[in-house]
Amino acid sequence: MATAGVAPASGIVDVNASSAIAVDKLPDEILGMRIKDDKEMEAHVVDGNSTEAGHVIVTTIGGKNGQPKQTISYMAERAVGQGSFGVVFQAKCLETGETVAIKKVLQDKRYKNRELQTMRLLDHPNVVTLKHCFFSTTEKDELYLNLVLEFVPETVHRVIRHYSKMNQRMPLIYVKLYSYQICRSLAYIHNCVGVSHRDIKPQNLLVNPHTHQLKLCDFGSAKVLVKGEPNISYICSRYYRAPELIFGATEYTSAIDIWSAGCVLGELLLGQPLFPGASGVDQLVEIIKVLGTPTREEIKCMNPNYTEFKFPQIKAHPWHKIFRKRMPPEAVDLVSRLLQYSPNLRSTALEALVHPFFDELRDPNTRLPNGRHLPPLFNFKANELKGVPAEMLVKLVPSHARKQCSLFASS
């Protein structure tokens, strides 16, 4: 199929991760509308379904709107992730030598695949690119959708684990880079596309270890959240699950992604999960240990239908005591703004981007520890900046970076 804009790579599930992968139990949520006689959904079907190393898959792309057809061959190299959704494997394009990730999921023939529909809408430097897709069949006549994605070699999860094993703190510049790019990807999907990711976690944040550019992946749980329409609450991996989800809310907002981003930032700073709950209920206990018992008003903000109130009264633990003594106060402040019980009191992704914690990234003299330049951080497109107040715009795009920003370049 024709190249679509940017999108996730991998519903990579790290089998060593201790958190539960709740979204894998929700196939009905992942598959959206019924398929009609839709030209857009046409894709070449290839026989065979092997992902064993050395297996070659041949498919064709193009052939629509006057485009020439092109044959592409992929050789499977190794599995890089698996779950009940299917498998993600690394492959090499034999024609170009390019390495890609192919996410293969069982496709219900009655429905469109929501992940594919979402990914076709996406085009952003901090979201993994969907190159094209094709269907494959097995001897049992099972149909699989194969998403051919940009390959990014590392995950934030593995980077955190690397520093943890070395008994070292992650350099603060990397914490800033990763969390800034997470917020930028969320600002884009929330404001420009109108989609909530619903499974933000370190395993779904891919990193190029040389440039430290971060890309959000795995849109298997992503959904347009419409006000007044119910959604499932059993979504998002446990350690990163917003409290309104634990309270069973079904009319939540994209603020659930902001909570998850706050949990990831806390984990980057601590070197371990901020709220490591052993179960859904225990997850809430871990949150209460830090934020204190939510007030009746806060519970009402999270889930108006929740009537039980049987929690022990625990005072909030000061954030600065959660982190090491020399932790910059700006880091602690940003965590506290992202991790609010009331969803409407959490910072938005755009508000987070202009937080003083990221001021170092806006300094034109800032470099990576190896002396190299930072990855592109301010190459905003016009749709990313639409409706942004002037005072925020000035902070968002520093003067030295305005040439690479389309809005300023055209003015």
UniProtKB/Swiss-Prot annotation:
Tissue and organ distribution: Absent in leaves and petioles while a moderate expression is seen in the stems, roots, and nodes.
Q: Which GO terms describe its cellular component?
A: cytoplasm; nucleus
Q: What class of enzyme is it?
A: transferase
PROSITE patterns in the cross-refs: PROTEIN_KINASE_ATP, PROTEIN_KINASE_DOM, PROTEIN_KINASE_ST
At what positions is Phosphotyrosine found? Y234
Return one Gene Ontology term, BP aspect: signal transduction
Q: Which family does it belong to?
A: Belongs to the protein kinase superfamily. CMGC Ser/Thr protein kinase family. GSK-3 subfamily.
The name this protein goes by in its record: Glycogen synthase kinase-3 homolog MsK-2
Active site, per annotation? D199 (proton acceptor)
Write out the entry's keywords from A to Z: ATP-binding, Kinase, Nucleotide-binding, Phosphoprotein, Serine/threonine-protein kinase, Transferase
Tell me which residues make up the Protein kinase domain.
74-358
| Gene Ontology MF terms in the entry | ATP binding; protein serine kinase activity; protein serine/threonine kinase activity
**Source species, please?**
Medicago sativa (Alfalfa)
| Signal peptide location | none
In terms of superkingdom, the source organism counts as: Eukaryota
EC numbers: 2.7.11.1
Give me the residues that bind ATP, please: V80, G81, Q82, G83, S84, F85, G86, V87, V88, K103
Which reactions are catalysed by this chain? L-seryl-[protein] + ATP = O-phospho-L-seryl-[protein] + ADP + H(+); L-threonyl-[protein] + ATP = O-phospho-L-threonyl-[protein] + ADP + H(+)
